[in-house]
A protein has these predicted regions:
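Conserved Rossmann-fold dehydrogenase catalytic segment
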Residues: 136-143, 170-186
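Rossmann-like NAD(P)(H) cofactor-binding subdomain of soluble oxidoreductases
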Residues: 54, 61-69, 73-147, 163-164
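Short, conserved active-site loop motifs that form the nucleotide-linked donor/cofactor pocket
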Residues: 57-59, 172
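Conserved anion/nucleotide-ligand pocket segment
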Residues: 147-174
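Glycine-rich beta-alpha junction loops
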Residues: 32, 107, 134-138, 154-156, ...
Length: 186
């Protein structure tokens, strides 16, 4: 399966590194072309996750269409204030019934709107497989393979199972839930 990570900060980079040991087509979108070039050359995200090696298996692009088109799973890992905008931007290339994972942390605004609500609104009619991924994790720990645990939550059990299957490993534990509100507010 093609997996697109939308966001190349510390958390997005760490989450992609975690997937590198599995048999998937991995691509990470970085909005800054110069930074994407630097990451391709050095195989490191020196700005946000120094010291963590980015395996060659992970393609890095600054072209959103290239990242999203054909992806069965799209993981949005941007600052919370741009999650909904990013969901709207990727919509033209989003595959029907793709799993869209929100790995960003926080709320959409000061009124308490959840990030998954904005994603759901933007991709309505294309997919209902929206998953919130959250846990007591730090990018610098995940990026170097330290043990961690997270929760994947969705109203669609199949979507949660896909995310659990993608990430579950001896050092990265993924627990399923249907309480997306609780996971996002927790």
């Amino acid at each position: 399966m093609k997996i697109a990570m939308i966001g190349a900060g510390g958390w997005g980079t760490a989450m992609m590194i975690e997937l590198a040991g599995r048999n998937n087509d991995l691509i990470m979108y970085c909005r800054n072309p110069a930074r994407a070039d630097e990451m391709r050359k050095t195989r490191e995200n020196g700005e946000y996750l120094p010291g963590a090696h980015i395996p060659e298996k992970i393609r890095i692009t600054s072209d959103l269409e290239e990242a999203v088109e054909g992806a069965g799973c799209v993981i949005i890992c941007t600052p919370s204030h741009v999650v909904e905008e990013m969901a709207a931007r990727l919509k033209p290339w989003l595959m029907k019934d793709a799993v869209v994972v929100c790995a960003s942390k926080g709320l959409a605004d000061n009124e308490g709107h959840r990030l998954s609500e904005g994603i759901t609104k933007e991709v309505a009619g294309i997919t209902d497989k929206i998953v919130a991924l959250s846990g007591p994790n730090h990018a610098e720990e995940v990026g170097i393979g330290l043990p961690c645990a997270t929760v994947a939550a969705s109203a669609v059990p199949e979507a949660v199972q896909i995310v659990q299957d993608l990430y579950m490993s001896p050092v990265f534990r993924v627990y399923r839930s249907d309480d997306i509100r609780g996971v996002e507010y927790g």
